[in-house]
Swiss-Prot record:
Designated gene of the protein: fezf1
One Gene Ontology CC term in the entry: nucleus
Keyword list, A-Z: Developmental protein, Differentiation, DNA-binding, Metal-binding, Neurogenesis, Nucleus, Repeat, Repressor, Transcription, Transcription regulation, Zinc, Zinc-finger
Job of this protein: Transcription repressor. Involved in the development of the forebrain region.
Cell compartments where the protein resides: Nucleus
Mapped zinc finger ranges (C2H2-type): 261-283, 289-311, 317-339, 345-367, 373-395, 401-424
Motif (Engrailed homology 1 repressor): 34-49
Protein known as: Fez family zinc finger protein 1
Cited InterPro entries: Zinc_finger, Znf_C2H2_sf, Znf_C2H2_type
Polar residues bias (residue ranges): 453-466
Amino acid sequence: MDSSLQHSTTKILSTQESREALSNRLTMISGAKPLAFSIERIMSRTPEPKCLPVASLLQSSAPKGDQKPGLHINSSSIPRMIPFVPVAYEHCAKIGISGAELRKSHVDSSPPFSCSDLLNCALTLKGDFPREALPLQQYKLVRPRVVNHSSFHAMGAAFCYFNRGDSEWHPPASINIHPMASYFLGSPLHQAPKCYVAAERNKLLAPSVEKFPSGVTFKDLSQAQFQHYMKEGPRSLSDKITFKTSAKFSSASPSSKPKVFTCEVCGKVFNAHYNLTRHMPVHTGARPFVCKICGKGFRQASTLCRHKIIHTQEKPHKCNQCGKAFNRSSTLNTHTRIHAGYKPFVCEFCGKGFHQKGNYKNHKLTHSGEKQFKCNICNKAFHQIYNLTFHMHTHNDKKPFTCPTCGKGFCRNFDLKKHVRKLHDNSGSSAGTRGLGATGHQELHLPNREQSHTIIQSPQLQKSVY
């Protein structure tokens, strides 16, 4: 009877002690700042850690006068599986100790390390402490399933050893959290690290961290991959999952070269088949995207959308020398070459210079003698397909651009402008007029120097712009 009562009393006391230990543990973790991820969720999915007794590993030989209150960890055990969770701590004045001092401190019996001393102990242990003194390599580091890397540093994390590289990174002025648990176990991420970054009071204990060999970063892992990453080591995971690596990682496998798509005509190389498809109209001359206002054709739909701004009469970019306005700043920059007399594109056949590369390419087609685009009605051939498109308006009697002075119609806006400059440049009969002309079409004033004339545009075509 007495023995059973004593056994039950001992069981109750042990249960209370375990609850108090768990309460102290949660209090220590809850002292940190609010995290970007839920610690409770991480701890609920993480297996209960087993304890590995380490005799006098975390004992310090620090002088008694140099002691300051800080976060103290029980020196009797180190968790075998430690989650990558930031832990709150207080600063202490001690910065670092050498390997000899560390070995000496392990012999002496002194109060336990504070947080920074414990961290420096782990750093030195990774460097020159005898590997046989503590078999850490057989224990695995467990990571959380959800990690927000940017939010982690935004909270004021002291350091981050994950793929830090060789960049000079300085911690913020006030540091109150850091993932110190990640340095205690033999993490397979760093089999032969050069040095680690550890920040204490805005000072770098070591300059850099060796990059992760396979180039895996937080953004490269999906949530499913990250869960798998916890259960299996990165070595076994790298054999099953192909990560997105860049050229800056020298250890990338030769078999992970990106696919290339080569143009059979000019030999130009592209990294995607879509880019090759967009390139092919350069050789075929196809311009499937045609402006319904002026009939000009384009190879890409995005270029057509930019072209439609021309017909909206919005030209905020003005030339300081002649006052001519443009709808795009790039067009204004090209226009300034006219005043400077700069013609960088020179034809190698006739020596004619051009301000724009597009005009230079169109001019070169006149020397080739190849007119592969022919009209099915009159068999007239053209160098480019959009010229054939304009020509087809002559057979359909579609001339949307009409001169208000003489009533002559044109298929293209460019032809109307040229007609006005040659014949009606000095005529001001219709200057400043708006409304409906003699043909009953809507009038749009010319935006350039031919402001005394108007472009007569069909209402049906004008509606198709918007």
